[in-house]
């Protein structure tokens, strides 16, 4: 066992007390990204090593692996703690997204080590989708590169507001303050093009030598700021989901017996309490919350992020993919939306194609009406294209087979994030972030009932040879 972990358990008074203490620590999810060979895996290995999160057998194995696959001569190659795939060790690069967990006395952490190569952009986007902070590594010898800009853009596109720019390999530039200042100014000039109100920090460090990672560097007396670990431990993440409107996507209808009917899922945002009036979309039927059932028993009130089962006072028709929200909120269903897409398939995305999509437990079909532009993520310019290639990022117009209830991704990632699924292979081929829902269903709802709209979508989906027109716009 890790001796530090054993000491912590002893100090807490046993395993059970230690586990309870861990549960009450805040959790920070962050990723490391940057250009190839900037030292991302080495940095994570250094964090694990200096916070004493490595077990004795892992340390022994690391000594042996460093001799066979290491790139640091006689020193320990800490990157091998993270690069687990054989291909990664042989090439000395990161390919897959590697997740690691560690904790300190102040906070728990989940790290996503993402690849730096451009052909693995889809892997990087996958890792960033669940993170709240991004560490952007920059090689002090090379400065801000195109891949640095690319990863910065993807991180902000996926809703990350906290960026830590770690200027690595300071030992190779003699710990020069001038180099640090120049790179800092270059990045701030570029960051002015990034969307959103960002919190950007800068830390000069050497992942290989451990300078300013978990302890203050004696080689850089000119830097008086926080170490990287101190930044991670103290950064305040604004989790605003509790203050947002209630969103409860139904994942499962729970019917264990004739006397119980509950709707299970995770509360995506807001809060819900017993007695609250709620509305079911897209049907619009209203009811009251009779019970809130959790693993620990019934609760009177729950908040965003909790897995719950809601029991309503009325027996109404609710199925997987329906959305519950506060009854007094007006959220119209939409038939179309503009979506920021990260394409992940060899076959490019082209106008006219149809895909199955999945969003907040709801599975339906969407057609690509057009591609407005592709983003050149090396310089953040937009260009017109006929299709979106592998690893391409662009703004795409979609039309759905049925009205959906959507939020902008920046407002709610659960009800604003979707995936594209190939209808033949059932493989996930793309990820989408709702840029702007296009309210068309509202205008048509006065002319057609919800049943007529659903029947129309059903006929067009299964009997296209009938030539039925789209009631929401004859598309």
Curated annotation (Swiss-Prot):
Assembly notes: Heterodimer composed of CysD, the smaller subunit, and CysN.
Family stated for the protein in its record: Belongs to the TRAFAC class translation factor GTPase superfamily. Classic translation factor GTPase family. CysN/NodQ subfamily.
Gene transcribed to yield this protein: cysN
Catalytic activity: sulfate + ATP + H(+) = adenosine 5'-phosphosulfate + diphosphate
Tagged with keyword Cell membrane: no
Database matches in Pfam families: GTP-eEF1A_C, GTP_EFTU
Annotated region (G4), positions in chain: 168-171
Region feature G2, mapped onto this chain: 92-96
EC number: 2.7.7.4
Pathway: Sulfur metabolism; hydrogen sulfide biosynthesis; sulfite from sulfate: step 1/3
UniProt region (G1), positions on chain: 34-41
Domain tr-type G stretches: 25-239
Natural source organism: Shigella flexneri serotype 5b (strain 8401)
Gene Ontology molecular function: any one: ATP binding
GO terms, biological process: hydrogen sulfide biosynthetic process; sulfate assimilation
Chain spans, region G3: 113-116
Region (G5): 206-208
Xref: InterPro entries: CysN_GTP-bd (IPR041757), CysN_II (IPR044138), CysN_NoDQ_III (IPR044139), G_TR_CS (IPR031157), GTP-eEF1A_C (IPR054696), P-loop_NTPase (IPR027417), Small_GTP-bd (IPR005225), SO4_adenylTrfase_lsu (IPR011779)
Assigned keywords, A-Z: ATP-binding, GTP-binding, Nucleotide-binding, Nucleotidyltransferase, Transferase
Residues the entry annotates as binding GTP: 34-41, 113-117, 168-171
Domain of life: Bacteria
Function field: With CysD forms the ATP sulfurylase (ATPS) that catalyzes the adenylation of sulfate producing adenosine 5'-phosphosulfate (APS) and diphosphate, the first enzymatic step in sulfur assimilation pathway. APS synthesis involves the formation of a high-energy phosphoric-sulfuric acid anhydride bond driven by GTP hydrolysis by CysN coupled to ATP hydrolysis by CysD.
Name of the protein in question: Sulfate adenylyltransferase subunit 1
């Amino acid at each position: 066992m890790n001796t530090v972990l054993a000491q912590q358990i002893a100090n807490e008074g046993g395993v059970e007390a230690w586990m309870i203490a861990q549960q009450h620590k805040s959790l920070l999810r962050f990723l490391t990204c940057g250009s190839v060979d900037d030292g991302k895996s080495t940095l994570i290995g250094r964090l694990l090593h200096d916070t004493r999160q490595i077990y004795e057998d892992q340390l022994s194995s690391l000594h042996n692996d460093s001799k066979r696959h290491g790139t640091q001569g006689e020193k320990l190659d800490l990157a091998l703690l993270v690069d687990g795939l054989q291909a990664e060790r042989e090439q000395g690069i990161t390919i897959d997204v590697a997740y690691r967990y560690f904790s300190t006395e102040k906070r728990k952490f989940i790290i996503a080590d993402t690849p730096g190569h451009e052909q693995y952009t889809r892997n990087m986007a996958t890792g960033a989708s669940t993170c709240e902070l991004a560490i952007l590594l920059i090689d002090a010898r090379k400065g801000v590169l195109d891949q640095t800009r690319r990863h910065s853009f993807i991180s902000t596109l996926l809703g990350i507001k906290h960026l830590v720019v770690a200027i690595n390999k300071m030992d190779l530039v003699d710990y020069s303050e001038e180099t640090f200042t120049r790179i800092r100014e270059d990045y701030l000039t570029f960051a002015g093009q990034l969307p959103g109100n960002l919190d950007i920090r800068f830390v000069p460090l050497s992942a290989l030598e451990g300078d300013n990672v978990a302890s203050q560097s004696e080689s850089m007396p000119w830097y008086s700021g926080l170490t990287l670990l101190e930044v991670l431990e103290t950064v305040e993440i604004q989790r605003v989901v509790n203050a947002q409107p209630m969103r409860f996507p139904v994942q499962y209808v729970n019917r264990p017996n004739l006397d119980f009917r509950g709707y299970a899922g995770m509360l995506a945002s807001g809060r819900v309490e017993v007695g609250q009036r709620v509305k079911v979309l897209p049907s619009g039927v209203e009811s009251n919350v009779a019970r809130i059932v959790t693993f620990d028993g019934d609760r009177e009130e729950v908040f965003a992020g909790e897995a719950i089962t809601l029991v309503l006072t009325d027996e109404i028709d609710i199925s997987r993919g329906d959305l519950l929200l506060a009854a007094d909120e007006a959220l119209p269903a939409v038939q179309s939306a503009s979506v920021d897409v990260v394409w992940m398939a060899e076959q490019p995305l082209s106008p006219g194609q149809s895909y199955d999509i999945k969003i907040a437990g709801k599975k339906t079909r969407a057609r690509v009406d057009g591609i407005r532009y592709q983003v050149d993520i090396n310089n953040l310019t937009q260009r017109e294209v006929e299709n979106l290639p592998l690893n391409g990022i662009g703004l795409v117009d979609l039309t759905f087979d049925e009205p959906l209830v959507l939020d902008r991704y920046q407002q709610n990632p659960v009800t604003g994030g979707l995936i594209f699924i190939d209808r033949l292979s059932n493989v996930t081929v793309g990820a989408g972030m709702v840029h702007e829902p296009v309210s068309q269903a509202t205008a048509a709802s006065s002319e057609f009932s919800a049943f007529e709209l659903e029947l129309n979508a059903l006929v067009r989906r299964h009997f296209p040879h009938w030539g039925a027109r789209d009631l929401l716009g004859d598309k």
